[in-house]
């Protein structure tokens, strides 16, 4: 069996798309090989400057085969038959026929001779290279090819021989290059093992997962050597593994003066902006050290550490300056600055948004002074120097500035947490933060819907789906007894609008279904879904349990029977007991009347238990009473009884949706 080695050597490939390219090229090459009946074991490796494919167990030749090509019907016009023959360069006598669905068709049996694999590989390799679609690609020079970054070399060998492959201006060879530290020394290779060995000798670790494992192990070793801890950050490890061909973990020091900064500022400066790893002592306090991944084994690692310490100190010096500037002013002093910041061109400034949020909070809990104060100040940090430099710290800096002003913890936490949850995995805020989060998200939703920014199938630029799901989660997980319907009305009034309410309610219902869909059947969700979200999970569990019992199943069948008899008609009038002439209809009416007074939606468990007492009389009614009596008055009276029965079910859930 044979082997193929292909390396696409380029300028720096962004770290965040290397893994996708690895998986994408594996999929494309596998598919194209299979289409050409070449079956092989394929591996793809990615790194900062190369994408490598290694295929083994390749045959040396393709197997001869016959391809059956369907032509026109034997009854088709002669011109169509001649056209088919001409297209395949055969005569009519060379065609065979086959009966398909009582119709005779011409077929051409094309014989494909065996071919040397090395003859067809260049063509399908170029096809595969072109087929992968990068998120963004580029042209360079005057060349007519495009790739994620300028390609500098293509290595392609099949059984130690260079394949005559041409991709744009690049002809394949048997040369690769080591780490930049080796001055891009040319390395001639004969096969995969030779390739891998020479790369390792020249400070290139081919396998992405191996680089990640080296980084992970080295981080723990460095942390332990300083008697410190490090929090696992797989995403950052994956990213720095894509930035380094030969990762070496080094440790730098943080000057003590910077430790007065909030820990989130330190983490953001190091992790997000510098790709550094933070260290903590055994009590989880921030340690005055950081770890970073160097791309290569430098002779003077101290110089590398000093360089990184200098870069971090410069960034933290700026952060400390911004922080001191910010705490010299109050959050309230920033309110006027919000007037100059646009929330949305059709919806005014952030100052106007804050006023609306505050009004919604007053509507929710008019006597809650902490909530109202938090609402007034919740966006003030957006015009701070620190958030201008580190936008990801919005809310967090507001918390620290509120604490610096000696505002109480409840206000500070509400300012910090009102952006939560920021995804399905994020926790929901509690207390005043929960109410403020609802007010903020609801104002955004209502305003942006009015502004015509409703999500579409192709996009949701304002993340309204996430914001509505956030409101739903906050209400459900905090068991908040909020009248969402009236809240939507109030929010619409703040925009002096009464349009789009139905669209907004429909949007809430759609996201609620999404929230529950993995746990409950959609018909069950539809049966209990309304804007009173606080008890919806309890209702779902209770109704699910009820319908799994034998009594519940029988009652549902009885409801459906009653509903089917009634159809879509809405019968006017009230039941007249004087028209009863059977005991079952009298008993069903009496139980229905009694239950209509006892069943209350809020006491759901009790309501379902009471509903079970309907089973015996309704079963007896259907077994012994003819609804469509010959006397029209009696027939109508019995239909009215069934209508009352259905209304009783509807007090508990929309049973017509089950």
Curated annotation (Swiss-Prot):
Catalysed transformations (reactions): tRNA(Gly) + glycine + ATP = glycyl-tRNA(Gly) + AMP + diphosphate
Subcellular localization(s) per the UniProt record: Cytoplasm
InterPro entries: DALR_anticod-bd, Gly-tRNA-synth_bsu, Gly-tRNA-synth_heterodimer
An MF annotation (GO) of this entry: glycine-tRNA ligase activity
GO biological process: arginyl-tRNA aminoacylation; glycyl-tRNA aminoacylation
Any Gene Ontology CC annotation: cytosol
Pfam annotation, one family: DALR_1
Catalytic class of the enzyme: ligase
Superkingdom: Bacteria
Catalytic activity, EC: 6.1.1.14
Alphabetical keyword list: Aminoacyl-tRNA synthetase, ATP-binding, Cytoplasm, Ligase, Nucleotide-binding, Protein biosynthesis
Subunit structure: Tetramer of two alpha and two beta subunits.
The family this protein is said to belong to: Belongs to the class-II aminoacyl-tRNA synthetase family.
Protein's UniProt name: Glycine--tRNA ligase beta subunit
Gene of this entry: glyS
């Amino acid at each position: 069996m044979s082997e193929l080695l292909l390396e696409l050597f380029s300028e720096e490939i962004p770290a965040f798309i290397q893994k996708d390219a690895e998986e994408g090229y594996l999929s494309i090459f596998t598919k194209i090989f299979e289409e050409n009946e070449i079956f092989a074991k394929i591996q793809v490796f990615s790194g900062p400057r190369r994408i490598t494919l290694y295929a083994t167990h390749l045959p040396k030749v393709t197997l001869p085969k016959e391809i059956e090509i369907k032509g026109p019907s034997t009854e088709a016009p002669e011109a169509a038959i001649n056209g088919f023959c001409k297209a395949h360069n055969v005569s009519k006598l060379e065609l065979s026929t086959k009966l398909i669905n009582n119709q005779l068709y011409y077929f051409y049996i094309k014989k494909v001779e065996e071919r040397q694999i090395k003859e067809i590989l260049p063509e399908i390799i170029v096809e595969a290279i072109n087929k992968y679609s990068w998120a963004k690609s580029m042209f360079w020079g005057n060349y007519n090819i495009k790739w994620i970054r300028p390609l500098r070399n293509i290595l392609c060998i099949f059984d130690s021989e260079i394949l005559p492959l041409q991709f744009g201006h690049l002809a394949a060879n048997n040369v690769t290059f080591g780490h930049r530290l080796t001055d891009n020394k040319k390395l001639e290779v004969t096969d995969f093992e030779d390739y891998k060995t020479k790369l390792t000798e020249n400070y290139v670790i081919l396998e992405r997962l191996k680089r990640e494992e080296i980084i992970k192990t080295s981080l723990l070793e460095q942390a332990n050597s300083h008697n410190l801890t490090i929090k696992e950050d797989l995403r950052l490890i994956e990213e720095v593994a894509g930035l380094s061909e030969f990762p070496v973990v080094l440790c730098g020091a943080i000057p003590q003066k910077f430790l007065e900064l909030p820990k989130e500022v330190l983490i953001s400066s190091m992790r997000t902006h510098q790709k550094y790893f933070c260290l903590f002592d055994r009590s989880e306090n921030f340690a005055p050290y950081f770890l970073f991944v160097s791309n290569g084994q430098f002779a003077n690692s101290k110089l590398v550490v000093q360089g990184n310490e200098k870069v971090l100190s410069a960034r933290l010096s700026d952060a400390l300056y911004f922080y001191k500037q910010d705490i010299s002013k109050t959050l309230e002093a920033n309110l006027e600055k919000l007037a100059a910041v646009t929330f949305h061109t059709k919806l005014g400034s952030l100052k106007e948004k804050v006023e609306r949020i505050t009004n919604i909070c007053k509507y929710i809990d008019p006597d809650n002074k902490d909530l109202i104060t938090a609402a007034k100040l919740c966006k003030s940090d957006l015009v701070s120097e620190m958030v201008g430099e580190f936008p990801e710290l919005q809310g967090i800096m507001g918390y620290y500035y509120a604490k610096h002003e000696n505002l109480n913890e409840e206000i500070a936490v509400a300012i910090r947490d009102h952006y939560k949850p920021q995804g399905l995995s994020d926790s929901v805020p509690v207390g005043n933060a929960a109410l403020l989060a609802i007010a903020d998200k609801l104002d955004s939703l209502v305003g942006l819907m009015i502004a015509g920014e409703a999500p579409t199938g192709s996009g949701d630029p304002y993340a309204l789906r996430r914001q509505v799901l956030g409101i739903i989660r906050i209400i459900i997980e905090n068991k908040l007894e909020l009248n969402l319907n009236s809240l939507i009305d109030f929010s619409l009034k703040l925009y002096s609008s009464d349009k789009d309410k139905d669209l907004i309610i429909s949007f809430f219902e759609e996201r609620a279904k999404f929230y529950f869909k993995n746990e409950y059947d959609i018909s069950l969700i539809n049966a209990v879904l309304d804007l009173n979200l606080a008890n919806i999970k309890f209702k779902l569990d209770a109704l699910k349990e009820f319908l799994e019992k034998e009594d519940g199943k029988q009652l549902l069948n009885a409801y459906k029977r009653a509903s089917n008899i009634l159809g879509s008609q809405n019968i006017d009038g009230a039941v007249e007991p004087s028209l009863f002439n059977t005991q079952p209809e009298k008993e069903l009416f009496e139980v229905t009347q009694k239950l209509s007074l006892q069943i209350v939606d809020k006491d759901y468990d009790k309501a379902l238990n009471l509903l079970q007492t309907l089973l015996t009389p309704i079963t007896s009614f259907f077994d012994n009473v003819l609804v469509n009596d010959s006397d029209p008055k009696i027939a109508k009276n019995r239909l009215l009884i069934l209508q009352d029965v259905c209304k009783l079910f509807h007090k508990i859930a929309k049973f017509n949706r089950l």
